[in-house]
Every structure is written in structure tokens, then in C-alpha cells.
Amino acid sequence: MTRLLWSGSAALVLAASALVAACGSSSGGSRFNGGTGEDGGNGGGVTDGGFLGDSTVAPPPLLPDDGGAFNSEAGALTISPSAPTVTVTLGATPSMTPLQFSATYKGATVGAQWTIDRGELGTIGVGTGLFTPATLGGVATITATYQGSTVTTPLTVKIVYVGYGDPNAPDAGAGGAGGVGGVGGSGEGPGATSGQITALNGTPTADPALLFLYPYDKTVFPQAVLPPLLQWTLGSHTSIAAALIHISETNYDYKGYFQPPATPFQNQPVPQAIWNAVAYSNSGENVSVQVTLLDSAGALWGPISESWIIAPGTLKGTIYYNSYGTNLAHNLCCAIGADGTDDGAKFGGATLAIKEGATDPVLIAGNDSECRVCHAVSAGGSTLITQQGSSYSTSSTYALTNSNLETVVPNNNGDGRFTYPAISPDGTLLFTHETASALYDINGTAITGVTGIPSKLSAFTPAFSPDGTHIAYNFAGGTGSDGASIASIDFAKATNAFSNAQLLYTPPSGEHAYWPSYLPTNAGIVFDVETVYNGRDTAGTRSQCDTPSSGQGGDGGLQPENPCHSEGSHAEIWWVDVASKIATRLDNLNGKGYLPPHASYTGTNGDDSTLNYEPTVNPVPSGGYAWVVFTSRRLYGNVATINPYWSDPRFENISSTPTTKKLWVAAIDLNAKPGTDPSHPAFYLPAQELLAGNSRGFWVVDPCQQDGTSCVTGDECCGGYCRPGEDGGLMCTATQPSCSQEYEKCSTSADCCGVNQGIQCIDGLCSQTGPK
């Protein structure tokens, strides 16, 4: 499995001496790696381009650590200074002064050996005690050792960054398929003038009409995701000359002064290096975000304020999704042009993927002659299955571990049973969708000797649990079915035996629950509840019609303004606790009570919080959260603002105006209590194609790496562990250590090094059990 480092420029420098210096107790240890044997810690991991002049980002591995803390005998050995704070100024006027530590033993200064447990914060001379800070903030532990005695002191590093523009700004250009920086908008503006900077440091006037559109207040972001695009309302202010972006947390403070990248000045991305530094300097506290605006008349307005949460972990895997309107394939005809008529241009229906560090998606299934859209993916990342556009009863599998090799899965029954099957995590089995459900191998051959499937069971939108021991589904057919409820059944692969079919949740009359997906713990299931049916595709997301008939208010021609083209399916994301069968709507994820109004929406139910569909859960938790990717037709700030149902290029021109049909990601607290809402406000998934309708994201882990392959964490490795190799670099291995680090293999929680610090064995990996 390849760790998904959405920020792109990742570098990992490993040294055996740094590993030795960094290892401490099982609850600590350095998160970054680097440095040499000449210093007592890791060489810096993240630089910001302002002080050190580049934007390299080192992802933070949890280094191998089998326990064994230093034995402190501090009565005779002391450190000076005690609990110091070092402040580093970066950006336009950088300033950094090393800090000299000294050790005293029985009243005399001695030559101690020095180490630091967090080398990403700086280095310390092993024999000199001279600490040189890097470019991240945080609290480290400095240890002095002399004649068998050790003593420690905390060291706080605070970073203050003041920037005028961004010295490492990306090329705005055309932005690629994913938009500028993978998030759209107008890119970064130039630095503010000296006069504007002086004015921006003044006292602003509050204006309640100035509000953040995106990101949302209290959004939880993972580390290493691409930086978000800040988007705000302007109220009555028509001419903004400059803006101050102020992002602060306990040990990192950033102020960026910018002129507009475009008119109107209504969005600005967070600089990449700043975003990385904020994420890796965070220690669990909320991040304060403020934007202050200077108008052309010299009046200062704001600040617009909110806060975010940074999860202490990176996201893992690849997201596979279908795109309707993609420019990466041209197999459908024809798109509407700017004049509202069919211009003969082809567009694509295809399955795409967002890979490590990308700002744009790549084509996986489909080409210029064949549409490939309806799909499912195995949680282990080995296999994708998708329906053929030329014959809906026929599907194809794609070997994601073998250059996406396509194999046709014939269906002589002609009933589309392989359109949306559940795929076992290892990619070897299919549990069929909708028709009389049965178990098949990945080539479409029925498995013999299967027992326990209820008579005439029709499992619609089925999904395996991450460990392959359960399947959840919409109860579409069979004894007691209603076509509306979520149910589950247990599965034992060794015997192909099914058992314990049970009903989990039935929505109110007239509503239907679809698209279940298990949380990594198997304790809960996320699904959507369709509250308004569009009248034409079950469990869909589309409008009520494409070409309105006279009875629908049109004449059968291309009239996108007609009511049935502007109204469609509504759905909300819920979760159910499997043990108690208590279901709860995820209001924080859905956006209840805080999403901005959708001004372009002409439907009768104009609430964006009811436009959320098709959730799937990343099988690997990270930072104490499960991560859900889902389809939404909500506004994306001021970038995607058209009617939510205008996403089909044949009936609406989306070649230059982004549709709102996009993929979003939300964090869910692990081990939440039944009946509570453990979700958090969602963020826009970076790198998806901006000028296309995107949906049905599958977040899966990448195929594991063999022993001897470089790694960052153990979940990338087939052997289950990521440990130092002969050259000091982290390598995949099957050799079992005395205890497993986070993301390494486990059988029980007792296998995990951090079991006393809340680390437990979840789906075979040591993982945090909840947010810190």
C-alpha cells in the first residue's frame, strides 16, 4: 500500500544514527526522519521556502520503537536552560538563533551526550549541545546523558512566518483538469505593497456580510492533503485591493499579505509550504483562520474568522471514481456549447483515479470508444469492476496490480448482476447486486458449495466489510424485504458459509436507504437515505429529466431551465451502530444548519444538506478517525455555483462553468457512541476533475509492497512491518518486532506498542481509537 501524500513533494531521508537517537518509549519517538550521526536527532523534515529556500516535505513516519525509556537520575545531572522556548522568524525577514544547552554534574559543567526526540523540530549536536531549529513548531524533549545518568527538559519551538506573497507560488496557468493546485480558483495573488501591508495591520471594521464559504468552520483535515482554497463572500464590497491571511496555532503563526489574483478577489489558496508546516506543527489544538480585506478606498474590513482541526495522520490509498463529462476520454456525444445548442463535441464517461501527490486525476477504465462508469473496487486495491457502456449486461474487471489489465466478465443472463457487486477485500469474490444474490469468483463463475444465503435474497448496493467477514446491503428482495432497509449478513470465506442475516435500519415511509459502507472497526455502517426520488433511477443522484416533455413544462428540446431538469434526487448520509441497531443522521457531514444558500437552485427543496449520496469509507483509519468519501451536489464555495443538477454535458454547458457534482471527504470519530453524530464538516476532495460531474468514489488501499521495498509505515508492506534496513532506511519486512507501531500488523491490541496510549488493533492494524 502506498501512503497517499496528497501534498505532492515528499522526500524521506533516513539515517540509522538518527533512528537510534530518536527511539524512546513506546508513546513517543520522532515522527520524522533525517539527519546524520553528527547530530542528536533528525535533520529537518519540512522547509517552507522562506528561510531554507525550498519546499520539500518529509512525511512523518512513526519510527520503529520497541519500548525502553531512559532511566532518569536527575538529582546530580542538570540541564541549562530549563524548559526554554526558541522563536524562529521565517518569510520576508528570516531570523534564527541557535540555542546552546549545557549540562552540570555535581556542580561542574560536563561534556554530556545530547539527543532530541523530535528531529523535525531541529538538530542538536551530540557532543556540543547546540540546538539548531528547523521550520516546524512544537515541543520536543532534550535529553542529556553523562556517566550513566540522564536528565531531560522540554524545548518549545515557535515559528513566526510573515510573507508578502508566496516565493514558491505554483504556476497558475490553466490549472490542469483538477484546477489550480488541484482545488480550482484563481491561484495565488502577488504580494501586497508596503502601503497595503501597513493598512492591513490596522484595526478592521466588522461586517456581518463577510463570511467564509469554504472551508467550513470546524472542518477536520488530515496531514499531507493538498492545501484548501479559502473562499469568502464580499457582501457589498465590490473592489478589494489586498488581503491578510492569518493562520495561527500554539506553536506556528503565519501572516500572508496578498494582492488579488483576479477580480473579484474572493478566493485565495493557502501556500503549500505554509499548509504543510501548519499541519505538522499542530499538536491537537484548533487552528485559527482569519481573512482581513482592504478595499480600494483604503477601508479595512473583517476579520472573517473560523477554526479547523488537524488530524495527526495522513490519508492512505487511492480514490477511484466515475466521471461523466471527463476530458480524459471522448466516447459520448454530444455536449452543449456556450450558445446552448448541441455543438457536436464529444465528452467522456469513464472511471478515474486520484493518485499520490496528484493535482489531476488519471484515466483507469474507458477510452475514446467505450464508456466505463458504474463500478466497484476491492478494499485491498487489487481489482476494479465496471459495467461496459456498449452492453450494460456485460462488465469488465481491471487488474490494478497488473497495468490495469482488462478481462471481460460475461453475463449470459443479461440482467446486469455484475453492475454494482460487492467485491471481497482481496479482489477474488463477487457478491451480486439486486438479482437473486449469489457468490461468484472474480471471473464471473458461480462458487459451488455456498450455504446460508436466504432464499430469493436480493441484495442491492452490497458492500463487504474491510476484513471480508460481513456484507451490508439494501434489502431489495427476499422474505421480509421492503426495498428500503439496510441489512447485513455474516460471511466465512474458508467455508463459503453465510449466516446471521439481520435487519439493521428501516427509514421512514417513502424513504430508502442505499450504498452501505462499513467503518474500519466493523462496528458501524455509513449509508445514504434517499428522501426524494427522482422518478427514474433508483439510488441515483440525477435530476427528474433531461429533455422535458410538454407535460413536464417543455417541448422535448434542450431547455435546462425547465423545472424537472432543475430538481432531482435528495439524500442524506447516516450511520448505524451494528450492535444496537441505532441509526443517526450525520448532520455535521451533511451540512445541517451551516451550508451557505444555493442561490442558483430553483428547486422546491433548496437545501444543500440534502444533496449527499453514495458514501464509502477508507478501510484504514488515520489520526483517530474514519474517513468517508461521498458524492455531493452542494456548492463548492464560489467556484462551483450552478444549479446542483446541471451536470450532464448533453443538457448543460459545463465546459467552462464547473458543475457542483463533486466528491467530498469527512472525518468520523472512531468508536462513537450509538445515537450520536460522530461526523465533522467535510472538505472538497482535491485533484478531481473540475469541469466534470464526479461521483461514486471508492477509497481503497494500494497493493502491498514486498519485503525489502522502501516504506513509510507498515500497512504498505505485505509482511506487515516497516523497519530500518541495513542502510538505516525504512524497509518492508515480515520479521515480527517485540511490538507493532501504529499502522503495523497486529492480531490483538496487546501486539501494539502504544496499547497504553489508546492504540488498538483495528482490522489487523495498530490504530488510534479516536481523536486526540
For each predicted feature, which ranges?
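Bacterial N-terminal signal peptides that target proteins for export
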Residues: 1-12
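Ser/Thr-rich, Pro/Gly/Ala-heavy low-complexity intrinsically disordered linkers and tails
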Residues: 6, 15-87, 120-125, 129-132, ...
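Short S/T/G/P-enriched beta-strand
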Residues: 64-104, 150-201
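Short, hydrophobic beta-strand segments
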Residues: 129-135, 272-276
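A short beta-strand micro-motif common to beta-rich folds, especially ectodomain repeats
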Residues: 137-148
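Sequence signature of WD/YWTD-type beta-propeller architectures
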Residues: 162-710, 733-737, 767-772
